[in-house]
Amino acid sequence: DTVTSPDITAIVAVIGAVVLGLTSLTIIILFGFVWHQRWKSRKPASTGQIVLVKEDKELAQLRGMAETVGLANACYAVSTLPSQAEIESLPAFPRDKLNLHKLLGSGAFGEVYEGTALDILADGSGESRVAVKTLKRGATDQEKSEFLKEAHLMSKFDHPHILKLLGVCLLNEPQYLILELMEGGDLLSYLRGARKQKFQSPLLTLTDLLDICLDICKGCVYLEKMRFIHRDLAARNCLVSEKQYGSCSRVVKIGDFGLARDIYKNDYYRKRGEGLLPVRWMAPESLIDGVFTNHSDVWAFGVLVWETLTLGQQPYPGLSNIEVLHHVRSGGRLESPNNCPDDIRDLMTRCWAQDPHNRPTFFYIQHKLQEIRHSPLCFSYFLGDKESVAPLRIQTAFFQPL
């Protein structure tokens, strides 16, 4: 049968209508998708989503003043990235209840600001002064991952001598970690600030220095129980609650989780094929084999005690980082500070045993420090007659290696 002209016209009309309909439907679907994406971007992000927005106006203003702030006030680095569920379990805090006031410290990657947070401690608690950590503009994906690791890590800790994470703002960029504010800054700067001229009364007594060591040791006991290896115990990575040296309410906490590595660059050494290493605080097995354990943390704590007694001297004075590496590998050790009590010197020496298993536990160290702290010897150094106190008053004599 032949197809007539009207039949062909009808077929063409049907095909044209189908094509036109499909084209219109495609356009409608594309328009709907674009509209939905734009609408979705305007919505507040749901829990756990990370949405890039324009830079926080408040942060931008403070960053404009960053050049006037030095690095001396640095305060505030787990191997796997936290899961989405772990990120969502972090203590989220509304950005509109957080105000940033001034820059406290800045390194190559991170910044720490002082701010206030409304009702962050509890509903109705009012404004609390806080420290706020954020990444610098242009942070890499790796740095952002480390930032999330830090938040997840800190959220696990709950101890009077571990810096507390109060909340996070992760829904938008820039992301923030909200931490308790430690007004005394980092311990290294605090110790160095206590140095006085000859024949002037010390701002920190031996009892004060032992109390500082005890605070840190208590935090280490907790980390040991949590099976957490710090890897970078040092005075620069601890924080002090009070600026005043005579304050009875002073508390020292383990508080680094990153920025100090930016600030005190000279305390680190970049070994070929590895990241920055705090060689002056590292045990032989860490330097030789890259092994880090609670035993290597004990070694580092011994160095931290030495730092405390010398009011913040750099360990192994006069040696370069590479010289320190060879010195420790070959069995060399720090010399005892002048006039250091025998019990404290012996405890430091035990922390630096060549065999890691011969080093004491943090629980034992805490017990021993408490024993020394309350001993008649320590009391005589603190309150004794002029002859026993005189060496402590001449700090340039007492706080120097032999």
Curated annotation (Swiss-Prot):
Location of Phosphotyrosine modifications: 268
Organism: UR2 avian sarcoma virus (UR2SV)
Recorded catalytic activity of this chain's protein: L-tyrosyl-[protein] + ATP = O-phospho-L-tyrosyl-[protein] + ADP + H(+)
Enzyme Commission number(s) of this protein: 2.7.10.1
Keywords for this protein: ATP-binding, Kinase, Nucleotide-binding, Oncogene, Phosphoprotein, Transferase, Tyrosine-protein kinase
MF (Gene Ontology): ATP binding; transmembrane receptor protein tyrosine kinase activity
Active site: 232 (proton acceptor)
Protein name: Tyrosine-protein kinase transforming protein ros
Domain (Protein kinase) ranges: 98-377
SMART domains named in the record: TyrKc
Residues that bind ATP: 104-112, 133
GO cellular component terms, semicolon-separated: plasma membrane; receptor complex
Presence of the UniProt keyword Kinase in the record: yes
GO biological process assignments: cell surface receptor protein tyrosine kinase signaling pathway; regulation of TOR signaling
The keyword Cytoplasm belongs to this UniProt entry's keyword annotation: no
Miscellaneous remark of the record: This protein is synthesized as a Gag-Ros polyprotein.
Gene symbol of the encoding locus: V-ROS
Record family assignment: Belongs to the protein kinase superfamily. Tyr protein kinase family. Insulin receptor subfamily.
